[in-house]
Amino acid sequence: QPTVGIPELRKAMADWYKRWYHVELDPATEIQPLIGSKEGILHVTLALVNPGDQVLVPNPGYPTYTSLNKILGSEIVNYNLREDNHWQPDFDELEKMDLSRVKIMWTNYPNMPTGANATMELYEKLVNFARRHNIVIVNDNPYSFILNKKPLSILNVPGAKECCIEFNSMSKSHNMPGWRVGMLATNAQFVQWILKIKSNIDSGTFRPMQLAAAQAYNNSVEWHEEANVNVYSRRRQLAEEIMKVLGCSFDRNQVGMFLWGRIPESYNDVEELTEKVLHEARVFITPGFIFGSNGKRYI
């Protein structure tokens, strides 16, 4: 059926995961091409979560995790990401929660909006946490190539495929926004459950775009170095200059396509700063509160 994606694309995705992440995937059973990874958020939720079930969502985090689960009737349970913990989950805090109704935990590393990078230690902790509590970790991993020379995958943890799903997106890794080509990788059973949902929603991606995407997965190391490191480094320098002009503090080790900064104490709140910039310079800067309450002093 067309929804599963053409064999050439699935093989290219599997080869790409092996080449860059050192993860072995069966292209026939452990990969599902997506019309952009964003639709995967819908498919995974419909496949694994029933109305009234709970889902763990990061604060701050990508707003779609919250809005879509609310639409589908899931109960949102926020878990904190804080600067003093390097924007990583506080597992001691998580262990104190009642997790009996939690079905999935959304994670996103490298992180949007904070720019926190992934580590294998973090991924190992997440996999162990998932196993202890019978929770599925859904790691949204589109930014691992942006300003990052060592991309990581949660699926590199032994046994992770049993309890983890990972998204990837060519919009970010290959600078192909608008093509709407993404993927998820996990165990064969999860793929089948997700495919049952997806096959009732769409009919797959235009074949020539799949063939072109398969070719793009062969891009060289040099291509990625220029497009995803060098070009973004020049843009990052400009963004850092803006942060300095505004008096914001930020971590220069951030990766991904965003720059996250803490506003000066001289402002009452982030809205005061963003409104000032909007009206005086006619530039919109995203206020951090849209990502959650832990972002209320950030842009």
What name fits each language-model region?
Residues 5-11:
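Long amphipathic alpha-helix in the N-terminal Rossmann-like dinucleotide-binding domain
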Residues 1, 12-15, 19:
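Glycine-rich loop-to-alpha-helix module at the N-terminal edge of alpha/beta enzyme cores
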Residues 4, 18-299:
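PLP-dependent class I/II
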